[in-house]
From Swiss-Prot:
Calcified shell. This is Cuticle protein CP1243. It comes from Cancer pagurus. It holds the Pfam family Cuticle_1. Transmembrane segments: none annotated. The keyword GTP-binding does not apply.
Length: 117
């Protein structure tokens, strides 16, 4: 929880603010903190949930999809299959009907046929 005098992190770690740090806080909200000097602190998912007093949401679970693109590879329209390497598979965070979210930030949009554009 982020308060006016310090922070209690989700892992239990405590941080006490100095008088100057405490005086610099302008507003504490659900997603972060705005300081009088114009800087801000953006909460990550766990910190925002902790600050709001809600338990963290579970990470998405991989599930089998009825489409040609999945976590382990792709079935191409010509009938050939391409198996992903372990690194390529690990880079896929979430695969859905309209695209894939990757850990390296290069998200993939799918066509109506479920193939990468």
């Amino acid at each position: 929880n982020y308060g006016e005098s310090g922070i209690v992190y989700p892992d239990g770690r405590l941080v006490q603010f100095t008088r100057a740090e405490a005086d610099n806080i302008a507003e504490i909200g659900e997603a972060g903190v705005v300081m009088h000097d114009g800087t801000h602190v953006q909460f990550d998912r766990d910190m925002a949930a902790h600050h709001a007093g809600t338990p963290p949401q579970p990470m998405p679970v991989r599930e089998m999809l009825a489409q040609p693109y999945g976590y382990s590879g792709i079935m191409k329209p010509d009938g050939n299959n391409r198996q992903f390497t372990a690194a390529e598979s690990d880079n896929l965070v979430l695969v859905g009907p309209s695209g894939a979210v990757t850990a390296d930030g290069k998200n993939v949009q799918f066509t109506d046929a479920g193939l990468p554009t």
